[in-house]
């Protein structure tokens, strides 16, 4: 019995919780070797019995049998895929239908958000927001997809009155870093935490007495060790990916939370500036 095919084709027959389970299994089939029903239930916010019943609905005796069957099917499909299909992104291949691709992408992003939010230390987050709010100058560093996240945050912060530099050129990033002063803040965005350009800038900022805030993964890294504060992000993407999709989703959830927290801290003035910005841009239409 091909359980993966059965799961893909039975979408309309599933309840809301069953669809959660189906989406999780499809998006994480390559990781099932290390997933238990207890972990899965906790992550999805459902009972273990719901997972067992789902497995039985598909014809398996329980979750263990379903899990092992899915692992076997995935391994077999990988061997076939190596010869017939292209590996496009994470667990997505050129043989997947658009519906399956959509489900895999959506679940990948949902998991990144859920796991990242579950890690938040809100007392520490509040402290970080207060530190940023008092900074005379803010530098944001990042490369590739992380640079896009940083650029978005810089626009948001400038809208509510903060002096921000977010340069794409790494030489300029380094130049700005060495000119930071005590009280200034550098927000370094790097999922790996090991990009030499970002680490170099963090070292320079710290040497000048600036506060370094890293938005990075849980992995031990040079950036994590340099930072005064860290904001953790989790992404379920495999090493092979066409683009940092769920990583950017996780990073954006952190930067958006920082922005809204800063708006809340100085709500009256921030809202006035947001309104003025909106009025000005409306005049350009």
UniProtKB/Swiss-Prot annotation:
Q: Which domain of life is it from?
A: Bacteria
Q: Where is the SIS domain?
A: 128-268
* Pfam families per the UniProt record, alphabetical: HTH_6 (PF01418), SIS (PF01380)
Instruction: List this protein's GO terms for biological process.
Output: carbohydrate derivative metabolic process; N-acetylmuramic acid catabolic process; negative regulation of DNA-templated transcription; regulation of carbohydrate catabolic process
Question: Where does the HTH rpiR-type domain start and stop, copy by copy?
Answer: 1-77
Annotated pathway, please?
Answer: Amino-sugar metabolism; N-acetylmuramate degradation [regulation]
Q: Which residues bind DNA?
A: 37-56
Which terms are listed as keywords in the entry? Carbohydrate metabolism, DNA-binding, Repressor, Transcription, Transcription regulation
Q: Which GO terms describe its molecular function?
A: carbohydrate derivative binding; DNA binding; DNA-binding transcription factor activity
Q: Which PANTHER family match?
A: GLUCOKINASE, HTH-TYPE TRANSCRIPTIONAL REGULATOR MURR
Describe its partners and assembly state. Answer: Homotetramer.
What is this protein for, i.e. what is its function?
Represses the expression of the murPQ operon involved in the uptake and degradation of N-acetylmuramic acid (MurNAc). Binds to two adjacent inverted repeats within the operator region. MurNAc 6-phosphate, the substrate of MurQ, is the specific inducer that weakens binding of MurR to the operator.
Record's protein name: HTH-type transcriptional regulator MurR
Instruction: State the organism named in the record.
Output: Escherichia coli (strain 55989 / EAEC)
Question: Which gene is transcribed and translated to give this protein?
Answer: murR
């Amino acid at each position: 019995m091909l359980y993966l095919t059965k799961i893909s084709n039975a979408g309309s027959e599933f309840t809301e919780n069953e669809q959660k389970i189906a989406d999780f299994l499809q998006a994480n089939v390559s990781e099932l070797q290390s997933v238990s029903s207890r972990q899965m239930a906790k992550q999805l916010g459902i009972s273990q019995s719901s997972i067992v019943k789902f497995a039985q609905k598909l014809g398996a005796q329980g979750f263990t049998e379903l899990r092992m069957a899915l692992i076997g099917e995935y391994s077999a499909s990988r061997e076939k895929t190596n010869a017939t299909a292209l590996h496009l992104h994470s667990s997505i291949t050129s043989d997947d239908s658009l519906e399956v691709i959509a489900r895999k992408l959506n679940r990948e992003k949902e998991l990144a958000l859920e796991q990242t939010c579950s890690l938040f230390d809100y007392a520490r987050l509040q402290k970080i927001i207060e530190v940023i709010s008092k900074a005379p100058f803010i530098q944001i560093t990042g490369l590739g997809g992380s640079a896009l996240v940083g650029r978005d945050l810089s626009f948001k912060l400038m809208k509510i009155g903060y002096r921000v530099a977010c340069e794409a050129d790494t030489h300029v990033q380094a130049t700005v870093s060495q000119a930071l002063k005590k009280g200034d803040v550098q927000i370094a965005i790097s999922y790996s935490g090991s990009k030499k350009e970002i680490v170099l800038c963090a070292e320079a900022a710290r040497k000048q007495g600036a506060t370094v805030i890293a938005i990075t993964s849980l992995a031990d890294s040079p950036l994590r060790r340099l930072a005064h504060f860290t904001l953790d992000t989790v992404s379920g993407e495999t090493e092979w990916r066409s683009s940092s999709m769920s990583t950017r989703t996780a990073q954006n959830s952190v930067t958006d939370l920082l922005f809204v927290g800063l708006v809340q801290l100085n709500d009256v003035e921030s809202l006035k500036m947001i309104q003025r910005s909106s009025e000005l841009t409306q005049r350009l239409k």
